Amino acid sequence: MNNSAINYQGYYKYFFILGMLLFSFGLNWSMFLVSLSIIIMAASLIVKIEITKPFVSIYTKWGYDFKLLFKDPIYLILIFVFLVNLISGLWSEEKPLWIWFTRMMLPFLFLPMVMIRIGTVPRKWIHGFWLLCISSIFFTSIWILFDYIQHSQEINEFIMKGGAVKTPISHIRYSIIIACSILILMQWIVKNEVFEKKFERWIYIFLFIYFIIFIHIISVKSGIIGLYIGLFIYWTFYLLKNKKMIQWLAMIATLFILSIAAYNLVPSLKSKVAYTVWQYSEWQKGKWLYYSDIERLVSIQMGLQIVKNFPISGTGIGDIEQVTKDTYYECLNHKEIKYAHNQFIFSWAACGLLGLLSIF
C-alpha cells in the first residue's frame, strides 16, 4: 500500500462508536436501533477499507472468521437460533410474518461476528459502551421515578387493577435491563478492575443502590425475580468458591431481609403482590380473562396444546399467529390471543424440536 493509503483504524472506530451510541439509546426506546447497532458494530469489525487514490478497496476476513466460528460453541449456538427461525419458513404459509420474525432474529447472525472481533476493541471502549447503556437507563429511570412520585396514588391503584408503571419500552423487558445493569455494576464494584478515577467507585455504588430501589418501585415480577436469582447465583459461586460458608449464609439472609423490607416499604410492590394473590384466587373460581398473570398462564397452556398438535416441526414461525388464534378459539371460544409466555414453549410451538434445542 502506498503512502496515500489511509489506515482503516482511523475509520472503523467511528462506526463502532456510532453502533455503541445507537445501542445505548435504542436499549430504552427502540429494538430496531438495537438490531441496527449490532449490524453496524459487526460491519466495523470485519470490514477493512483502504483508500488508495483514486480507488477505494474493501476487504473482509469472513473466510478466516468462518473458521473461528467452530472454535467456540457459543458462536454456533447463536447462529443456530437464527437458522432455525429462517428454516421454519419452509413450512410457513404466512410469509410476511416469517420475514418479520427472521428480521428480528438478525442480531443472532451478526452477534458472533462482533464477539469474534471484540478482542481487538480497546477495553476502555467496552467499559464506555456499558457506561453509555447504564447512563441511558439511569436518565429514563429518573423520568419514570418523577412521574411515579407525582402520581403515586393513581399508579398504585392502577397496579392493583393489573396495570404497570409506565416505561418507555415493554415493562418486562425494561425491568430485566435494570436487573442486568445492577449485576454489571456489582461486578465492577466487587472486582474493582475498571476504575480510572477513585470517585468512579462511589458513582457505581450509588447507581447500584439506586437501581435496586428503583426496580422494586416499578414492581415488575420478571425483573425482580431475575435480579434475586442473579444475585444468588453470583454470590453463591463467588463465596463458595472461596469457601466462605458463613458469608454465603449471610448473603441468603440479606436477600430475604431485602425482599421483606421492600415489600413493607415500597407501596407499588405491595400493591403488585396483593394483586397477584387476588388474581390466583379468582383463577380458582374459573376466571381468567383480563387478569394479566393468569392470561400468561393460559397462553402457556395454549402453547402446550400447539406443541401437542405440532410436536416435531412446529407450526412454522410464520404461521404461529394463525395457529394460536385457532387454538384459542377451539379451546376457549375466545378470539383475543397471547403468544405462549414462555420462550421454551413458544420456540417449540413455532419451530419444533429444533427451536426448543436452539435455546437450551
Q: Where are the regions a protein language model picked out?
A:
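Membrane-interface micro-motifs in multi-pass membrane enzymes
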Residues: 28-36, 100-104, 165-181, 222, ...
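Long extracytoplasmic/lumenal interhelical loops at the membrane interface
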Residues: 286-301, 305, 309-351
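Alpha-helical transmembrane segments of multi-pass inner-membrane proteins
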Residues: 86, 126-157, 169-241, 259-265
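Hydrophobic cores of alpha-helical transmembrane segments in multi-pass inner/ER membrane proteins
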Residues: 40-44, 108-114, 175-188
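A membrane-periplasm/extracellular boundary helix in multi-pass inner-membrane enzymes
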Residues: 217, 238-286, 301-309, 317
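Hydrophobic transmembrane alpha-helices and their immediate junctions
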Residues: 232, 236, 350-360
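Aromatic-anchored transmembrane helix interface
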Residues: 75-81, 95-118, 127-137, 141, ...
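Transmembrane signal-anchor hairpin modules in multi-pass inner-membrane enzymes, especially those
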Residues: 1-90, 117-127, 131, 188-202, ...
